[in-house]
Amino acid sequence: MRFTKMHGLGNDYIYFDLVSYPISSVDWRELAVRLSNRHTGIGGDGIVLIMPSEACDFRMRIFNADGSEAEMCGNASRCIGKYVYERGLTRKTIIALETGAGVKRLHLQVNNGVVETVCVEMGKAIVNEGLRMKDIRLNSSDSESAAWRPHLLETSETKVISPSSFILPPLSVVDMGNPHAVVMVDGEITDEMVWQSGPRIEKDPRFPHGTNVEFVRVENRQELRMRVWERGSGETMACGTGACASAVASYAKGLTDNEVTVHLLGGDLHISIDEHWQVRMTGGATIVFDGEVEVPLVADPR
């Protein structure tokens, strides 16, 4: 089966084009675990399926390196925009993409047939009062009102009994179609912070489906620095939805402007937030190589 390795700022996935090469009898969860292994597989943060859609131009499914399915990935969305245009699946420069978090519109900046950047309409950010991903709207009964402002959850030093004794740092819970816990850091974002705090917050029982965890330092009103522990994949070079969540949390706190550049390990993303808390993300995407891999067929695909 043919695949294409791509990355968005180092957030790398193995992409399968099921529009050009349709196949259904595959255990995608098992395949994601096997192929994502960087020693015995192709290596990546997971696999992404580019699929036909009845309602949109294309559909995206994402499986993390541990086999779990994710609702949305901003970096993968940009990569799909580049792939479908440069491989001739569409001539559109505005693409409707069906995801597990709803329809996302991709705006392609094309120069001489090459997609240089992709701007993704990420949708409306929700900053929650509690850890149950409940949509809380303040000062307005109309969810689209410009008067609505997200409410931030600020945990005090809360003792977490399970899975181990750990002091949960102050965080903000943001829904970008997938869950995010944003930790604002005053000083250096350390390896210990990411690799010890990240998995513990990810698996905290108050996040029943787990969460992505962002560690964020405000550089100035137009810049953030971020490292991310992704649910199901561990630390990655970049996370598009995480960059959006970080920008929303810092803007809602009054720490930054509504347009920021987020510096990640793999590069920079530009995030903008409008008066209705609709978020846009702009960045590049890279095709690394194409290949073929043997894929076992199963009677009961997942």
Predicted regions and their residues:
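Short, charged/polar, Gly/Pro-enriched secondary-structure boundary elements
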Residues: 126-130, 290
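A glycine-rich beta-to-alpha transition motif near the start of alpha/beta enzyme domains, typified by
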Residues: 1-117, 162, 182-302
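Membrane helix-loop-helix hairpins that form the core translocation module of multi-pass transporters
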Residues: 117-125
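Short, flexible, solvent-exposed loop/turn segments with mixed acidic/basic and small polar residues
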Residues: 3-5, 170-174
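Amphipathic repeat-derived elements
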Residues: 83-86, 127-128, 137, 145-146
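Anionic-ligand binding region
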Residues: 132-136, 140-163, 169-172, 181-206, ...
